[in-house]
Amino acid sequence: MGDELTDLGLIGLGVLLGLATVLRAAGSLAAWATGADAPTGNALTGLGVLLRPADPACVLRADGLHPAAYWTAVALLLGLLGVVVWQATQAVLATNHRQIRSPHHTPGTATRRDVTHTASERVLLKRSRTLRPSLRKPTAPEVGYQLGAAHGQGVWASVEDSILVLGPPRSGKGLHMVVNAILDAPGAVVTTSTRPDALTVTLKARERVGPVAVFDPQHLAKGLPAGLRWSIVRGCEDPLTAMIRATGLASATGLGGGSTENGGFWEGMTRSALQAMLHAAALDGRSARDLFAWSNSPSAAEDAAAILASHPGAATGWGQSLEAIIQADPRTRDSAWMGVKQALACLADPRVLDSVSPGPDESFDPEAFLRNNGTLYLLATGAGSVTSGPLVAAFIEDLVETARHLAAASPGARLDPPLLLALDEIGNLAPLPSLPTLMAEGGGTGLTTMPVLQSLSQARDKWGENAANAIWDASIVKVILGGSSSSKDLADFSSLIGERDEFTDTHIRGERGARTLQRAVRRVAIMPAQAIRMLPFGISLVLLRAAPPIITDLRTWTARPDADQLTTDRTQVETLLQTAARRTRPTPPTAS
């Protein structure tokens, strides 16, 4: 109690001294303004005015000082002092608010020195001869992707780094990451989306680099001249190609994601039937229409089994395997065939069937596409019973396998320039079965893989727990945006980032007024879950190898030097889409 009274006494004394100073200063100010004699008393004489408010001239010994002028000066000084105190308080509050809202200087995160030594342009260029052996003096954009900036330094990822982008809907993944990656890619690009927003910005720019094609089986971007037809049975004379194609189709059914009892078994049965049917169709020169007809019922697939049984180029045992599924007991057969029908259900849509039924002069050459730095846009919705997701997955697997073959025949067994797989909304669209492998091994063969997901929870749902963990572990660069509502993911991120020492100072007063300082140390999270969730729009948390977490200011494509040209390009493409939409819009019937 005594210490508290002492503190109160000191505070009161300070207030009195401050008030005395103001009252004394007001006398000097009023005397100067009115021409009266200057006060001669010290600061403490100002308190005497409170006892004789009507005669400040006598108290302050300032002849000619009028009371009205004096108290006006007092009011002015008190008002000025109030403004200064208010502004100082607001400045402190604003500083605290900025410290809470702006995570750039969070203790334990990467400093400018850390960024310089781990993610700068200089570090990237040191590895350039390994990344692009064909270039003598490469520039940073030729061997890497700029993610943003931190502490005035560019934050770069190399072309051999797998980049995982995590952010909820409307968190700016396309604005900050996908569009820039497509525009900056030094080689060919394969990109997916459920909407044509990235396409409208980048289509014209990529046309100036190489050939452009749009695989749009559901006509989400109808009116573009770069429409592509791709044969679903292309190359399936080769059993390995048929197996890869079937894996892409079967995985997109979701049977193996963990939500279906014995899902892995049924997905395997589906894959076995599909690879046999694809192989048979390719050997006998059949089309996607025949493949769809076979998928309608096991009895219709007898035709495919007969082709495999009689064709000399058929893979050994594939005909018998398909026949075994067809002749299985009804319950097993129907369950297995449910996956086959689901994988090819999209072919029931005439538009989709047409997109995978190219004419003789419409064949797509993936090798030429990759060698000429082409850009392929894959558009499909991720909802509905006739989603084209399985076709997109199969198409990507086809291109990836072609890229691997080209890389194997290239110097250093590396595709040069590298292929970018910008897989936006791939979790909603078509979960690629090979994504964990691509993330782990693709960089070494010249494949830059950048899946863009809404959360790790989405990855666990679409790929399963083990595969989702493999995707996370294999990503060299992890870009985490704010706004996540998954408490588990946020807690995992915070735990991965680690902890730091926080010092707490305590002032202790002894019995005789002596003060001592005690300092305690405790471990706290560098970035608690709340801080990660509250990352502002346009700011990301970048985890790069063993570097401290980098708080990065992302760059929007609208801030690029060529933004004006890109905006013009987007307007032209959107005009094409709108014109096509008006032409295909049904005319309402007129009243008779």
Placement of each model-derived feature along the sequence:
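Short alpha-helical interface patches
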Residues: 88, 95-135, 238-249, 293-297, ...
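Short alpha-helix boundary/capping motifs
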Residues: 12, 54-55, 89, 368, ...
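Short gly/ser/thr-rich secondary-structure transition/capping motifs
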Residues: 144-151, 358-360, 461-462
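Conserved ATP-driven motor cores of ASCE-family P-loop NTPases powering translocation/secretion/packaging/pilus
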Residues: 439-541
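A broad, low-specificity signal for short, low-complexity segments enriched in glycine/proline
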Residues: 122-129, 145-155, 174-175, 336-339, ...
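P-loop NTPase motor domains
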Residues: 18-31, 159-160, 164, 168-447, ...
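Low-complexity, polar-biased intrinsically disordered regions enriched in Pro/Ser/Thr/Gly
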Residues: 134-138, 254-265, 503-520
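Basic- and hydrophobic-enriched, low-structure N-terminal and domain-boundary segments
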Residues: 1-171, 175-177, 510-511, 542, ...
